């Protein structure tokens, strides 16, 4: 299991390092294998709310994000297919993500701070 990153637009900027602050635009869906794109119900999005700014690679985020975003370059747009063990696992995220749910995220690494 783990995370599979599919790049749609290659980045040309620097790659983040663990502990660095990243600026990301994202949308997250519950994975639904019956859909052609795998995207089921949307559970979160930064679009319209403002960029997501956080440290990467320090355990603040789900493991799938930490591992995949550290392999991205600024300007890259990718889809992350994250198995539940690299997401929220058995506990899920109350009210948003059920236990053992696989996740899909569209992620745009906009910058580093």
Curated annotation (Swiss-Prot):
Instruction: Give EC number(s), comma-separated.
Output: 5.2.1.8
Keyword set for this entry? Cytoplasm, Isomerase, Rotamase
Reactions catalysed according to its record: [protein]-peptidylproline (omega=180) = [protein]-peptidylproline (omega=0)
InterPro entries with a match to the protein in the record: FKBP-type_PPIase (IPR050689), PPIase_dom_sf (IPR046357), PPIase_FKBP_dom (IPR001179)
Q: Where is the PPIase FKBP-type domain positioned along the sequence?
A: 19-113
Q: Where in the cell is it found?
A: Cytoplasm
For this protein, the activity regulation entry reads: Inhibited by both FK506 and rapamycin.
Principal cellular location given in the protein's record: cytoplasm
Broad enzyme group: isomerase
Q: Name one Pfam family in it.
A: FKBP_C
Q: Name one GO cellular component term.
A: cytoplasm
For molecular function, the Gene Ontology terms on record are: peptidyl-prolyl cis-trans isomerase activity
Query: Any idea what job this protein has?
Result: PPIases accelerate the folding of proteins. It catalyzes the cis-trans isomerization of proline imidic peptide bonds in oligopeptides.
Similarity section: Belongs to the FKBP-type PPIase family. FKBP1 subfamily.
User: Under what name is this protein listed?
Assistant: FK506-binding protein 1B
**Species the sequence originates in:** Neurospora crassa (strain ATCC 24698 / 74-OR23-1A / CBS 708.71 / DSM 1257 / FGSC 987)
